[in-house]
Amino acid sequence: NLYQFKNMVQCVGTQLCVAYVKYGCYCGPG
């Protein structure tokens, strides 16, 4: 999958939070 569910605090570096959900967000290349 292009996007991978991760905790918000893990959306760092080359990843951006692209869709907020209840316990985190979907992260993708950015």
Swiss-Prot record:
Question: Could you tell me one molecular function GO term of this UniProt entry?
Answer: calcium ion binding
Name of the protein described by the UniProt record: Non-toxic phospholipase A2
The entry summarizes how activity is regulated as: Enzymatic activity is diminished by Cd(2+) and Hg(2+).
- Temperature note from the UniProt entry? Optimum temperature is 45 degrees Celsius.
Q: How does activity depend on pH?
A: Optimum pH is 8.5.
Q: Which family does it belong to?
A: Belongs to the phospholipase A2 family. Group I subfamily.
Subunit info here reads: Homodimer.
Organ and tissue specificity: Expressed by the venom gland.
Source species of the chain: Walterinnesia aegyptia (Desert black snake)
Any one biological process term the GO annotation gives: defense response to bacterium
